[in-house]
Curated annotation (Swiss-Prot):
Native source organism of the sequence: Staphylococcus haemolyticus (strain JCSC1435)
PANTHER family assigned to the protein according to its UniProt record, in alphabetical order: PHOSPHOENOLPYRUVATE CARBOXYKINASE (ATP), PHOSPHOENOLPYRUVATE CARBOXYKINASE ATP
Cross-referenced Pfam families: PEPCK_ATP
UniProt GO MF annotations: ATP binding; metal ion binding; phosphoenolpyruvate carboxykinase (ATP) activity
GO terms (BP aspect): gluconeogenesis
Gene that this polypeptide is encoded by: pckA
Protein's UniProt name: Phosphoenolpyruvate carboxykinase (ATP)
């Protein structure tokens, strides 16, 4: 990738040259350090369980991008991309490096982000905690040897000091916690939080800037490939079935969360998976369960005195996680890349019960739904939610997008055209009524519909437009009841369906206003009932 290599500051150089900065330790060496430092506990599965302390998830209100003249006009500033000035950043950066210099040991990893060498980012990760260093080794791409690692000249450096607490009045932060990205200094500075996912998502945010600036698409999606080389992408927010549907026995996993799309095809940005572990069972999700073995990091799970993990126990958080290298999964492609996609699936869990279980999208509709990033919050999942609420996350990944969302949508539209990609909207939510009245669409039906779409079986199918959303719905599909294909037929009262559909359309349109007049054409040609 055409990114200048990081110009090492004297303080960074000094840190890296210290004998106590332990470079490229093996998994076993890190296990010993984790246990000696009381950073985690060994489980009977062979995995290490670590606590992230006070913060069991990301801290989006504490994430900043340094405002620097060379790129400040490119950033989509706002609540997600908060500005911090360069002098404030450099002062805090210096304090963190001084703090780390006093530590008995540091842990250093060199690796890569991006499995396609044409667009690969070279990384150095400096960690205060040994388990964070193993997390980094699991989530990023490991060099083949220590010798290769020692020759890496990083394009970006992560400096992670979770036990360093910022003073907001002095350091210009909002709290003791900070995640600061500087594109000029090629650095992600993290402090005040032990949540390891900040490193993973920090690099994803960096790639979401660097790749599109070179007209390469970056995507928050999972991807798999069939025996004939046919590639499918799955976009979807939490609870839509992205992990479940992309883990198909007859297809190989490219990656489960972050991908790029360049002139060569699809490539995984990561070298590992960061799977949700709450309520995990071997019966329901064998692929993930079996990946939890020696080398895996578990976060915030409950472990008894015998080392047995209770995946159903949410005493610490609902956001329990398992971080493991992708080679812990059997059914994968290595290196994690493949050809251009044939099919894109947008997953949504519509708790209003009005979207069809599957619909084929035009390019404009695809761009509209990509920008919208819709799913539903359900009653009981968040405090105070008693009725279904729409949830919109731009491009299915709003917290990680430094650029104007229209940039990502334009790139997607160009690639859909160029590679003649079929795009489908798949509703894994409700039918026959909203949540509490209707019923969840059967996973059996959803799997079948997705399988048919991916295998190209719907290319020559007969479609009809639904009256409210203007979406193209298959008139029939073997093994799927006709009554659910067109959602109005699944409701006992069609007038109630129309009223509920109108309500959801209004919410979509209200949300879409934030994208401004430059997307007026997408709204007119890709919006509803067009």
């Amino acid at each position: 990738m055409s990114v200048d290599t990081y110009g090492e500051t004297p303080k960074i150089k000094k840190l890296l040259e210290k004998e106590s900065s332990l470079f490229q330790l093996s998994t076993t060496q890190l296990y010993y350090k984790i246990m000696d430092n009381n950073e985690g506990e060994l489980t009977e599965l062979g995995a290490i369980n670590a606590s992230t302390g006070k913060y069991t998830g990301r801290s989006p209100k504490d994430k900043f991008i340094v405002t620097e003249p060379s790129y400040k006009d490119n950033i989509h500033w706002g609540d997600i991309n908060q500005p911090i000035d360069e002098e404030t950043f450099l002062n805090l950066y210096s304090k963190v490096l001084d703090y780390l210099d006093k530590k008995d040991e540091l842990y250093v990893f060199n690796g890569y982000a991006g499995s396609d060498k044409d667009t690969q980012l070279k990384l150095t990760v400096i960690n205060e905690l040994a388990w964070h260093n193993l997390f980094a080794q699991n989530m990023f791409i490991r060099p083949d040897s220590k010798e290769e690692a020692s020759n890496i000249k990083p394009n970006f450096t992560i400096v992670s000091a979770p036990h360093f607490k910022a003073d907001p009045e002095v350091d210009g932060t909002k709290s003791e916690t900070f995640v600061i990205i500087s594109f000029k200094h090629k650095t992600i500075l993290i402090g005040g939080t032990e949540y390891a996912g900040e490193m993973k998502k920090g690099i994803f945010s960096v790639m979401n800037y660097l790749l599109p600036m070179q007209d390469i698409m970056s995507m928050h999606c999972s991807a798999n490939v069939g025996d004939k080389g046919d590639v499918a992408l799955f976009f979807g927010l939490s609870g839509t079935g992205k992990t479940t549907l992309s883990a198909a026995p007859d297809r190989k996993l490219i990656g489960d969360d972050e991908h790029g799309w360049n002139k060569n095809g699809i490539f995984n940005i990561e070298g590992g998976c960061y799977a949700k572990a709450i309520n995990l069972s071997k019966e329901k999700e064998p692929q993930i369960y079996n990946a939890i073995q020696y080398g895996t990091i578990l976060e915030n799970t409950v472990v008894n005195e015998r080392g047995v993990v209770d995946f159903d126990d949410n005493s610490y958080t609902e956001n329990t996680r398992a971080a493991y290298p992708i080679h812990h999964i059997d059914n994968i492609v290595l290196p994690s890349k493949a050809a251009h996609p044939n099919t894109i699936i947008f997953l949504t869990a519509d708790a209003f019960g009005v979207l069809p279980p599957i619909a084929k999208l035009t390019k404009s509709q695809a761009m509209y739904h990509f920008l919208s990033g819709f799913t539903s919050k359900l009653a009981g999942t968040e405090r105070g939610v008693t009725e279904p609420e729409p949830s919109f996350s731009t491009c299915f990944g709003a917290p990680f997008l430094p650029l104007n969302p229209n940039k990502y949508a334009d790139l997607l539209g160009e690639l859909i055209d160029k590679h003649d990609v079929d795009v489908y909207l798949v509703n894994t939510g409700w039918t026959g009524g909203k949540y509490g009245v209707g019923r969840r669409i059967s996973l059996h039906y959803t799997r079948y519909m997705v399988d048919q779409a991916i295998k190209g079986k719907l290319k020559n199918a007969e479609f009809t437009k639904d009256e409210k959303f203007g979406l193209s719905i298959p008139t029939e599909m073997e093994d799927v009841p006709k009554t659910i294909l067109n959602p109005i037929n699944a409701w006992s009262d069609s007038d109630k369906y129309r009223a509920q559909a109108d309500d959801l359309i209004q919410r979509f349109e209200e949300n879409f206003k934030k994208f401004g007049p430059e997307v007026e054409e997408i709204a007119n040609t890709g919006g509803f009932n067009k």
